């Protein structure tokens, strides 16, 4: 399933706050990513689960999270990973900031991070985790694959740098993104700061191509430094969603019914409510 790519255009950096001691702000970025498919038979549904389970096994997820830590400019301290039976996998990494971030790096700049083609901290609270949840409907043939990713950093490194990479690392039909900043830090005058960068929407940290490819809605609570964005892929081509069979194996009326069910499934996940 081909997904939109695009070149990240990094915005001008925000004025930096010179802090007293260590930057104690905790920045947390959480993803729920859904990939949807239609598997006609019970055999196809089982093959889909096995395919997804192998494609995103613990080894592959470790590779993705390793790239995430490189993108945000962190060091890996420890890795714990596990494949589960009958399906699913999880990986947890403890990460820390570089001891001395090189001058001129953009790890602490809030802007679109790199895409894949360009590529738990026992420091405090910094960690990266991922869990996978393959499942299928026993009757109507719809199968879903959910990935939960959490990136939490304490200090100057920003999890938003990994935003574009993570979206394009999976076949992302629906994406729910949450970003929050917690704690406080002080500048040299002793003034407390509860956030150290400007942000009015998570959408500002996506490439233009990604913004154009997805329908997006925001629910933000600015005074609490909570930002929430939902994303639904705009273009729908049934050929991209048929697993184990081509369109020539279906009558046109059946294809129309499948497409309607698939779109309903995606809308229900997007809005987090049943529409039927």
Curated annotation (Swiss-Prot):
One of its GO terms (molecular function) is adenosylmethionine decarboxylase activity. Pathway: Amine and polyamine biosynthesis; S-adenosylmethioninamine biosynthesis; S-adenosylmethioninamine from S-adenosyl-L-methionine: step 1/1. The modification Pyruvic acid (Ser) is found at residue 126. It catalyses: S-adenosyl-L-methionine + H(+) = S-adenosyl 3-(methylsulfanyl)propylamine + CO2. It is an enzyme of class 4 (lyase). Is synthesized initially as an inactive proenzyme. Formation of the active enzyme involves a self-maturation process in which the active site pyruvoyl group is generated from an internal serine residue via an autocatalytic post-translational modification. Two non-identical subunits are generated from the proenzyme in this reaction, and the pyruvate is formed at the N-terminus of the alpha chain, which is derived from the carboxyl end of the proenzyme. Its EC number is 4.1.1.50. Binds 1 pyruvoyl group covalently per subunit. It comes from the Bacteria. The record marks 125-126 as: Cleavage (non-hydrolytic). GO terms for cellular component: cytosol. Its cofactor is pyruvate. The active site is at residues 126, 131, 154. Keywords: Autocatalytic cleavage, Decarboxylase, Lyase, Polyamine biosynthesis, Pyruvate, S-adenosyl-L-methionine, Schiff base, Spermidine biosynthesis, Zymogen. It holds the Pfam family AdoMet_dc. GO terms for biological process: spermidine biosynthetic process. InterPro entries: AdoMetDC_fam_prok, S-AdoMet_deCO2ase_bac, S-AdoMet_deCO2ase_core. Heterooctamer of four alpha and four beta chains arranged as a tetramer of alpha/beta heterodimers. Catalyzes the decarboxylation of S-adenosylmethionine to S-adenosylmethioninamine (dcAdoMet), the propylamine donor required for the synthesis of the polyamines spermine and spermidine from the diamine putrescine. Belongs to the prokaryotic AdoMetDC family. Type 2 subfamily. HAMAP family: AdoMetDC_2 (MF_00465). NCBIfam families: SAM_DCase_Eco. This is S-adenosylmethionine decarboxylase proenzyme. The lineage of its organism: Bacteria, Pseudomonadati, Pseudomonadota, Gammaproteobacteria, Oceanospirillales. The gene is speD.
């Amino acid at each position: 399933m081909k997904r939109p790519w695009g070149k990240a255009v990094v915005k001008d950096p925000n004025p930096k706050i010179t802090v007293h001691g260590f930057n104690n702000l905790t920045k947390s970025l959480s993803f729920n990513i859904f990939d949807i498919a239609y598997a006609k038979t019970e055999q196809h549904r089982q093959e889909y689960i096995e395919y997804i389970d192998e494609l995103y096994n613990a080894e592959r997820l470790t590779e993705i999270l390793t790239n995430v830590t490189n993108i945000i400019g962190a060091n890996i301290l420890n890795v714990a990973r596990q494949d589960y039976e009958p399906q699913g996998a999880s990986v947890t990494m403890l990460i820390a900031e570089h001891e001395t971030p090189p001058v001129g790096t953009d790890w602490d700049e809030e802007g679109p991070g790199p895409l894949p083609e360009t590529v738990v901290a026992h420091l405090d609270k910094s960690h990266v985790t991922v869990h996978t949840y393959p499942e299928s409907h026993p009757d109507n043939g719809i199968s879903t694959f959910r990935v939960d990713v959490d990136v939490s950093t304490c200090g100057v490194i920003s999890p938003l740098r990994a935003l574009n990479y993570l979206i394009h690392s999976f076949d992302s039909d629906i994406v729910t993104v949450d970003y929050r900043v917690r704690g406080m830090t002080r500048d040299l005058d002793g003034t407390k700061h509860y956030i150290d960068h400007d942000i009015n929407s998570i959408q500002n940290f996506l490439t233009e191509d990604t913004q154009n490819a997805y329908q997006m809605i925001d629910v933000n609570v600015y005074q609490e430094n909570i930002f929430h964005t939902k994303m639904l892929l705009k273009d729908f081509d049934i050929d991209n969603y048929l697993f184990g069979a081509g369109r020539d194996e279906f009558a046109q009326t059946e294809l129309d019914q499948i497409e309607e069910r698939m779109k309903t499934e995606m809308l229900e996940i997007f809005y987090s409510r049943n529409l039927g």
